[in-house]
Amino acid sequence: MSAHRGAIQNSGFQTSVDIARQQPFAVAPLAGQKRPPSGALDEETNNPSSHAINGTSRQNLPTGQGLDFNRPQVHLPKSRLIASEICTVSGSEKEQKPRPDDPSKSQGSLQSLNDPRFGLPPALVANFAAAGVTSIYQWQASCLLGEGLLKGKRHLIYTAPTGGGKSLVADVLMLKRIIENPTRKAILVLPYVALVQEKLKWLRRIVQDVEKFAVDDGDPDPSHHRWRRMQKSIRISGFFGGSKTTASWDDTDIAVCTIEKANSLINTAIEECSIGELGAVVLDELHMLDDEHRGYLLELMVTKLLLLQQDIQIIGMSATISNTELLADWINARYFVSTYRPVPVDEYLIYDNAIYPAATSRQLFQTMSKLTTTGGPFLSEAVPPQRTIKPSAFRELSNPMSNAMVAMAIDTVTAGYGALVFCGSRVACQVQAALISEAMPDPATLGAEDLGKRLDLLAELRSLPSGLDPALEKTLIKGVGFHNAGMTTEEREAIAQAYDQGVLKVLVATCSLAAGVNLPARRVIINGARMGRELVGPAMLRQMCGRAGRKGKDEAGETYLIVGKSDLQAVCDLLEADMPAIESCLAPEKRGLKRALLEAIATGLVSGVAAIKEYVKCTLLYRTVDKKLSYSIMDSALQELAEEKLIQLNEDESYVATQLGQAVVASAFAPDDGLFVYEELKRALQAFVMDGDMHVFYMFTPLQAAAQTQIDWPTFRDLLDTLDDSGIRALQFVGVNPGFVNSMVQSGASLKEDTPEQVTQARIYRRAYTAFQLRDLSNEVPLPVISSRYKIPRGTIQTLAQQCHGFAAGIVKFCQRMGWGMLAAVLDHMRDRLEAGARADLLEMAQVTYVKGWTARLLRDNGFRNLRALAEADPKDIVPVLKMVNPRKTQRNQLHPTEAERYAGKLLAKAEIIVASANKIWEREMQVELDE
């Protein structure tokens, strides 16, 4: 007892900050310490033998430089596997393709951005040059100089291979339009948030210090000078789900948007009669017109713009469409087709450890079929491959596809290049990345600088609130990363940047990376041609292959498609398939025309039957189906909208949107989703459960996110058991029966969706289950805990939170348009909590960068009780609290001092940003109080 008392007296009163300061750094080791099969492997690992890319001799990786070499003192894992050797088959030398000339060396000034024909201001040309664009290719110049394009008088549809410079043409046309017409705006539409964020950075860099051609009014007043300069500058804003921008249509010159946000912006501009300010619309990835989920929104946008007949230039581009002429005819545009690739790409097929040129794939399959029926010689004897991969003695590489993948990846790295590996699922990403990392060269052979960069990457990921993924921890130190939708945004960005900068040598990704992120590689390896269970389409395959070859770094690129026996015929057909023709998504089975007509009527674009017919004539649907059929579809859609009370027919035979129809359009819901939300909200008005928050979380659960949710019924039952009276009443009120949940647990059955009633019931239960995840997010439960509780990836939860922000805003706007002001006010308050990921008492602190949810609560509990306290804090005092954000990392083995120092450095940098952000917000609030 006395011993205990002495310990207490010596320590005194300790806060959690004091305890955190005393804790040693303890995290999982950098990689698993699996022992190699034999001691001989350690000697062989450093001298793998394989074929170098394009005959290039191997470049040895950096090694230590003597006794005085100061390298990080960390325990590094050794390679456990040895990649198989790649051998060239005698008599099949690789044909050398002629490389294209540098565009700046041909056709003189025509290919220079300084050419007066382009009419670009010197500041813009200088910014392009600073970004590495000093000249353009002949096809780009020919396209830009097409009649009426640079003056904005003609629309343009064009195609070019991935990496061929498509975006530059649209950038030049759009920027020229904005610079020369200071009162006009532009909208740039991209399909994915990652692409929007990437484009925002690029455009802001390009337009820095570039001014619009504004007329000088001669006002000598110096106080007006700054205002005039602001008016001349080009303002670029991003509009996408989960963005925190406060910019509006009036605050921007170029709006970089996702498809949904762009459609909403155009609807608002039409409704407010400000559409005349729009000067250009750029549609990147135009093949998305054909997407069954979002394509119809692109067609809606273009149709509305065509009907308006305003002076708006439409520019559409894609690498994977075949009916360019039809699309150009639809919008009365010039069209241009380029097949030029600045970096040539060689394509290969790998089957049964043999490498064949992709051009011989059909011959390969035909020969294999004959051998199967006749029992002839080995395939490699009948159709000699260009190269072969030796079978592996390692059990993990006994599968020829895995053996080929590892061999090709290691061969690329050993030659000094980067490899991008595509696979069919999230789980496969992690498994294959781990497999490749086991055969990578030992980190001990790296120089201090390269090893330091990898350790910095580990420290950066370790400092995130979600912590460092154990699977990534094992592969990153070996130079291998993976990238999929199950990861958080911060993880994906850090991994992508590290690969782009050469810190990581191999990146294993799902197929969606090819469309969503621009990460080229010297060699692209496609391990199987399936995405999940489905075979990828020709367009997706082209996009993956198009990532091969990095302009400015590589003079060539290569793609390798690894295929198994069961898929060989399908892959042969795939390699020979043409790009799919784009079709309209307004067809009856896709129900897109209902939304198209509702939006046009609600925004006042059309009303009478004659005007509606003119509107239908502007659709792609009208160009691709029989004219009578298109009008028949129109009549059916109008009748459905009227029956659903979204529109009504006036006595003068004109249509007008009802209050419900206006609310559906204003909130950016599809008609069917809007009707479901209406019924839910109408029921909530009768008895909204106000003594808890479960009812609000249910209402804010996005319909699309819930539709993709797989319910874990035992977890659902456990969650219901934890609810208080208020929560149970709220869920029972919306239609959740705890008894039904128990029966699903006992039976192990899945939800039936055979009838409309069953579909509605399934939607309710999925939304209720997803609402628990939103509740946890808003109640400051750490992301890893939520991920473990619901058995779903952290990235999925983060995506849910981002989707929820947009959906919640739509719900609030819906209530406002319906005149339900009190309900809108209640929901709007809870929307702030959702965005902050915290309870009401932390909303002010949650405005600060890096301070969200659990982090905000820890700061408050450890003395930083408000915004002012954060603003006045010493960053060093915040670091111990940041160490507590991810406690599971402090319960394992100690970090080596070198790693601990890097980790602490990352946390200190974040603490400094937190203090600076808090200061900025605090000063702004004080200024508002002074002004009042």
Give, region by region, the residue ranges found by the protein language model.
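C-terminal or mid-to-C-terminal helical accessory/interaction module adjacent to the motor/catalytic core
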Residues: 555-638, 651
